[in-house]
Design a protein with these regions (language model features):
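Catalytic Cys-His active-site segments of thiol-dependent hydrolases/isopeptidases
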Residues: 82-105
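Glycine- and charge-enriched low-complexity intrinsically disordered segments
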Residues: 106-125
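N-terminal capping segments
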Residues: 1-62, 67, 73-76, 80-81, ...
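Residues that flank catalytic or metal-binding motifs in active/ligand-binding sites
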Residues: 67, 90, 117
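Short acidic (Asp/Glu) patches
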Residues: 55-56, 103-108
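Short, surface-exposed linear patches
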Residues: 35, 93-96, 115-119
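A generic structural signal for short, solvent-exposed coil/turn residues
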Residues: 75-77, 86, 113
Length: 125
């Protein structure tokens, strides 16, 4: 069993992408010091502004991902979606909450939907 198993199929209206990451960091990695700003609107521009405006407060880019690090994704060309990197039996996945899908999921990085593109991997500060 992987630590991410218990975070699959949580409704998006219960935990959006940032809330899912925050909860997993608290519960699985003991990072109770991380509290992301809450979104005030569910639109791409607002989510992107939150991420780009606060990214340096929480994480710094790394070249090689490790289990539990942040995954920043571009959504329609904007830095507007985050998840957690999961390495399971040598296969890289991302755990994230997707509004269109309606819940959280763990997807192989190689099979992300076309609406997402990995911008980079980040270690938590």
């Amino acid at each position: 069993m992987h630590w991410s198993d218990s975070y699959i199929d949580i409704p998006h209206e219960v935990l959006d992408c940032a809330q899912l990451v925050e909860r997993a960091l608290h519960e699985q990695f003991g990072r109770t010091d991380i509290h992301f700003p809450r979104r005030q609107a569910d639109d791409l521009a607002h989510r992107s502004a939150l991420i780009t405006g606060h990214q340096a407060d929480f994480a710094e880019r790394i070249e090689e991902p490790v289990d539990g690090c942040g995954v920043l994704m571009l959504a329609r060309g904007r830095q507007a979606h985050i998840g957690l990197y999961c390495l399971i039996q040598g296969v890289p996945y991302v755990l994230h909450s997707d509004a269109l899908f309606g819940s959280s999921m763990r997807q192989p990085l190689a099979r992300l939907p076309r609406c997402y593109r990995v911008e980079g991997f980040y270690q938590w500060l």
